[in-house]
């Protein structure tokens, strides 16, 4: 294996790690903020600290969606790690696998797939940096942490128009005598006005500072 092949493998690892630690968190944060801030989205604000209150709040969200005739099949329940822990404490179940290990994970709740979202990505608004001095995003004061969100996929349209990773050799890189990695991504998240009731957002009652 020559140096270029070895370098190619290294850049492959770099791209995967960059997407996992930089691209995906920013995409998640942007999309959840776009859904939470869309006009007409149902929801409420409250601090959930018990399993009973959490289960009741999620059940109230499903009732609101039922009243708005949102399709029952296909709903997804996105939750913060804290809320996921409360759900696990409020649901009675025990699954034994072939190794006799006990699994208390909750993958489905009332036919909704449960997906845990790190709290840093789960806010009602974010500020994107322009890349000139800082990269990524920040959570602005006045926004709210999201406890959970119920989403029907028909209510949203995530779009990735252009995504391309590029590698520049030292002979091409004009910034330094070094290899350079660049990722260009053009994307957006659209909430359909006639399907907006397919989103329910439950936020904390105290704003971020």
Show which residues each predicted segment covers:
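Long, contiguous amphipathic alpha-helices that act as assembly "spine/axial" helices in icosahedral shell
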Residues: 1-42, 47, 66-81, 166, ...
């Amino acid at each position: 294996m020559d140096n270029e092949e070895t370098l190619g493998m290294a850049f492959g690892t770099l791209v995967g790690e960059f997407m996992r630690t930089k691209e995906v968190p920013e995409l998640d944060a942007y999309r959840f903020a776009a859904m939470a801030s869309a006009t007409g989205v149902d929801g409420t604000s409250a601090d959930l600290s018990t399993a009973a209150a959490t289960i009741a709040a999620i059940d109230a969200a499903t009732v609101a969606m039922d009243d708005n005739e949102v399709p029952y099949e296909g709903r997804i329940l996105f939750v913060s790690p804290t809320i996921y822990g409360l759900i696990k404490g409020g649901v009675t179940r025990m699954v034994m696998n072939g190794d006799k290990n006990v699994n208390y994970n909750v993958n489905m709740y009332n036919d909704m797939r449960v997906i845990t979202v790190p709290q840093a990505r789960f806010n009602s608004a974010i500020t994107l940096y322009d890349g000139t001095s800082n990269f990524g995003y920040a959570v602005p004061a006045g926004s709210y942490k999201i406890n959970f969100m119920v989403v029907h996929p028909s209510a949203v349209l995530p779009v990735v128009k252009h995504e391309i990773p590029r590698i520049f050799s030292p002979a091409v890189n004009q910034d330094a005598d070094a290899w350079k990695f660049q990722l260009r991504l053009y994307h957006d998240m659209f909430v359909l006005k006639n399907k907006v009731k397919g989103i329910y957002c439950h936020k904390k009652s105290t704003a971020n500072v």
